[in-house]
Amino acid sequence: LFIELDALEVCAKALRFFSINRFNVLSFHERDHGDGAGDLNGWVRTHLKRAGFVADGPIFIQCYPRLWGYVFNPLSVYYCYTNDGTLEAILHEVSNTFGDRHTYLLPVSPAAEAGPIHQSCAKKLFVSPFNPVDHRYDFKVHPPGERYAIGIREFDCEGEVLVATFDGHRQVLSN
């Protein structure tokens, strides 16, 4: 699912089998993301402003929707734009099977906006018993377009220990 946070209700009204914050064949629940309190758009904008970003443009989320009420989003990606259309930051929200979440808010260099975008950060959340927290993530993101791709490489002090990728092509969600 790739959707603008300001357009959630509009999309739900237009689609028979898609709902926001209630059960349906496909649904998006704001409590599945962010701090779980409900106002996801406000939560992301507050997060951005606290980190010194402008946060005045559209915010899109790339994630899995609930399917018949069930979902697991190991990674949700928020694309945060300014009013002039500049991709300012990407918020990577990592979840584990225990229901814990951690966000990695990373700036996007104007030179990298055309893609692919490379970002790195220290790992902060226990995700797997096979990979401890003292690792580093490298994200490689192709900006949203007709094609969507993201790669995550995890490193320890000796080198690469995990590679995960997702690659897809945009399809319009319809009835």
Feature-to-residue mapping (PLM):
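Mature, function-bearing regions of proteins
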Residues: 1-175
